[in-house]
């Protein structure tokens, strides 16, 4: 069984998260997409409590048997996706993965990039994507929901909520 890890805070899950997961299911192809929530995500301060985020994802998974959820204490994508066949992310997260400032050294950064499985990246507005950054192990997902964001949903934008 081929499984894709889709790391994120999903605070809350949006129509964009769901569209990216569905695109990964078909494009990669995989048998299952696992939403992987970090207990302490990089670059996110005070996310909604984990049990509330898990409850929202459980409701989302109810009629999607190919969608699962996992929780991790890892923070770096290379650690989160270890053991998976594919790692799925938006262009904004991909830009973060390619930023060496999130690592203790350039050597650590290069080692982390080398550990990544196949990477599936979804466009996100005008955020540039470097599809050749890992020498051909990056594929682009045919989905772009532009400005859809969890921040906007938390601020009251209900039509972007996945539930």
Regions found by a protein language model. Name each.
Residues 1-163:
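Nucleotidyltransferase catalytic core that binds NTPs
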């Amino acid at each position: 069984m081929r499984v894709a890890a889709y790391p994120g805070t999903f605070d809350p899950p949006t129509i964009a998260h769901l569209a990216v997961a569905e695109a990964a299911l078909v494009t990669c192809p995989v048998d299952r997409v696992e939403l992987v929530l970090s207990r302490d995500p990089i670059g996110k301060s005070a996310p909604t409590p984990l049990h509330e985020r898990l409850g929202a994802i459980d409701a989302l998974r109810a009629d999607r048997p190919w969608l699962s959820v996992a929780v991790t204490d890892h923070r770096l994508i290379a650690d989160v996706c270890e053991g998976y066949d594919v790692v799925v992310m938006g262009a904004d997260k991909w830009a973060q993965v390619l930023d060496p400032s999130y690592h203790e050294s350039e050597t650590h950064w290069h080692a982390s990039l080398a550990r990544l499985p196949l990477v599936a990246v979804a466009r996100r507005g005008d955020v540039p994507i470097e599809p050749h950054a890992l020498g051909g192990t990056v594929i682009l997902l045919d989905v772009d929901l532009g400005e859809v964001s969890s921040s906007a949903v938390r601020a009251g934008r209900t039509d972007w909520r996945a539930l």
